[in-house]
């Protein structure tokens, strides 16, 4: 992994956290920091995340000239989701530099524009659509490799969660509002009508929620804020309830597991390729919508979700240990570093 370059973000977003963690794990020789103020909902920039690393800052989308300066002298470079300039892959190839992209299927432009310059390697961050991507682009051009997480980042949250007592306290992440109620918030709110168990449910969002998300239930508390330390989101809970309606990389699931929280999700890919069967909720296809291609939408079986919540209330602390073991074996730096070193 000599002379690696990495394109990074520093906003409070999934991409910001993902590229920050990859930087700390891979220790690239050079960074290209994308100041996303002009196009991201998250305006705060955290350039200090990358103190001690060499590189360049670009406001918005890099020009061909800026890419050539960034790539000069590198052996390979990696980016997440997008290169911010598709000429990056052509320029890298001209300079005999290997390129790779951690690609999310729903935002993969190559599904509708196969003529665009492609990286030498697609890295899939979840199992969702992995086989289809291999069929489209070749077995040797696509690999599954999830984003790394340092267990120490969530150590404090994990210790608090392991020690907490009393009535169960569950977390639901709305995050940044996405199309078609992606995280299944409305399904969860409907399921609450069918469970009388005693627990607290914290619904967290990064922005103000529509009226339909605001319901009167003594068990619900709303939290609408950004936090500087992602791990604080997962502190002092017993589980994450996230009945997602459509698939893709879900960093909150991975982060929750590292915090010692079991995660309740719909029984669809990639959830059912990661989580134990008993943590999954029956669901059915309820529609489709278009991103770069048609994406299936799933709705939870509401009464099954309510029963799963009742089941969760009765679980002892062993389920938290199981959650952390699952997170560590799949996402820890020590497990993933050799795999990244072998391909970059």
Regions found by a protein language model. Give the residues of each.
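A charged, aromatic-enriched C-terminal amphipathic alpha-helix characteristic of glycosyltransferases
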Residues: 14, 159-160, 297-304, 313-344
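Acidic anion/phosphate-binding donor-loop and adjacent secondary structure
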Residues: 111-113, 148-167
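Aromatic "clamp/platform" in nucleotide-sugar-dependent glycosyltransferases that forms part
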Residues: 245
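Conserved catalytic-core segment of nucleotide-activated headgroup transferases in glycan assembly
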Residues: 151, 163-216, 227
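Extended catalytic core of nucleotide-activated donor transferases of GT-like folds
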Residues: 42-133
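Donor nucleotide-sugar binding/catalytic pocket of nucleotide-sugar-dependent glycosyltransferases
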Residues: 120-134, 138-156
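Short alpha-helical donor nucleotide-sugar binding micro-motif in glycosyltransferases
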Residues: 71, 232-237
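Short hydrophobic beta-strand element within catalytic cores of glycosyltransferases
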Residues: 262-265, 272-275
């Amino acid at each position: 992994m000599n002379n690696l370059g990495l394109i990074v973000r520093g906003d409070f977003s999934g991409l910001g956290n993902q590229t920050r963690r990859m930087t700390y794990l891979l220790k690239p020789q050079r960074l290209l920091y994308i100041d996303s103020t002009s196009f991201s909902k998250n305006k705060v920039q955290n350039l200090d995340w990358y103190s001690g690393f060499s590189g360049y800052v670009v406001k918005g989308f890099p020009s061909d000239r800026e890419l050539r300066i960034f790539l000069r002298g590198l052996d390979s470079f990696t980016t997440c989701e997008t290169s911010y300039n598709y000429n990056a892959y052509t320029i890298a190839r001209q300079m005999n530099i290997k390129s790779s992209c951690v690609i999310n299927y729903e935002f993969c432009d190559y599904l509708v524009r196969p003529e665009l310059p492609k990286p030498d390697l697609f890295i899939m961050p979840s199992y969702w659509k992995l086989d289809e991507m291999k069929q489209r682009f070749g077995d040797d051009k696509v690999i599954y490799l999830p984003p790394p997480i340092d267990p120490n980042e969530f150590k404090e949250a994990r210790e608090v969660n392991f020690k907490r007592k009393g009535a169960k306290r569950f977390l639901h992440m709305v995050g940044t509002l996405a199309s078609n109620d992606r995280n299944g918030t409305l399904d969860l709110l409907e399921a609450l009508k069918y469970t009388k168990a005693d627990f607290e449910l914290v619904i967290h969002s990064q922005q103000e929620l529509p009226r339909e998300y605001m319901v009167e239930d003594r068990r619900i508390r709303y939290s609408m804020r950004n936090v500087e330390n992602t791990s604080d989101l997962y502190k002092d809970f017993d589980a994450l309830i996230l009945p997602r309606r459509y698939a893709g990389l879900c960093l909150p699931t991975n982060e929750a597991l590292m915090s010692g929280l079991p995660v309740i999700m719909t029984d669809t890919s990639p959830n059912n390729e990661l989580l134990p069967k008993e943590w999954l909720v029956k669901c059915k296809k309820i529609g489709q919508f278009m991103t770069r291609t048609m994406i299936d939408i799933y709705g939870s079986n509401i009464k099954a979700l309510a029963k799963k919540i009742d089941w969760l209330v009765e679980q002892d602390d062993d389920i938290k240990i199981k959650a952390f073991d699952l997170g560590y074996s799949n996402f820890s730096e020590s497990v993933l570093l050799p795999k990244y070193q072998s391909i970059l």
